[in-house]
Amino acid sequence: KENMSLAVPAIMPIDKKLLRGHIGAYGMRFHPKLHIWRPHKGIDLGGTIGDPIYATGNGTVKEVEITRSRRGYGTQIVIDHEFGYQTRYAHLDKVWVKEGDKIVRGQRIADLGNTGISTGPHLHYEVMYMGHHVNPINYINKNMSAEEFEDIISSARETTYEAD
């Protein structure tokens, strides 16, 4: 039971004091580069290139893709947290882990970047449960007060940081 509570994604992947701009919301939105409506499968957290990115739960690094391509997610990490959970951290600059690494919640795994289809430095963060995308905003309140969580919720709105 303790293993599961540490594996479930439950903290902000970036220090909330480093957030810049609004949070790009989960769900349908207008793609800022393709100019079409499509699902946004995660949230966008704006920051500065080089800001530390942290694992949101214990797990194993399933995938690391390092690229400077201006396509898709750019440089990204996928972590398997077991118990049906996976997380994706995309548009990264530097990666501090490799495939197969065991990681713990709060461990620095990467630096925020601007790779892939992106209109500014930010982290695109996804939570998947049993193979389906779920709204990450519901998984980030473990390390904040109710008031801080309400501030995050109220700032989550459509943005043009990226286009997945």
Q: What residue ranges belong to the model's regions?
A:
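Surface-exposed, glycine-biased beta-strand/turn segments
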Residues: K1-G74, R105, T159-D164
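Zn2+-dependent peptidoglycan hydrolase active-site motif and core
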Residues: A55-E99, P121-H122, E126
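C-terminal appended segment following the main domain
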Residues: D111-L112, I117-H122, H133
